[in-house]
């Protein structure tokens, strides 16, 4: 989950769109990455996180590879430039 730095709804929407574009581009590039989804909060309740990221990987080794992959690090650099807070949970289904 991320909180965005942008103040206006237009900037926030543009940042989310760019985040989505960069992250979905990782599918087929990062081995073991099955899917990646980025969704904005519905805005129904104040003080919620702005956006959530869910990624699915073949296994824990694929998750570790994803975290270290240069393409992921490049996408992460952009995400860090437009966010000011992050919460992460890794779990198995």
Where does each model-flagged region fall?
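Short S/T/G/P-rich N-terminal loop/turn motif that feeds into the first structured element of a domain
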Residues: 1-50, 58-65, 91-93
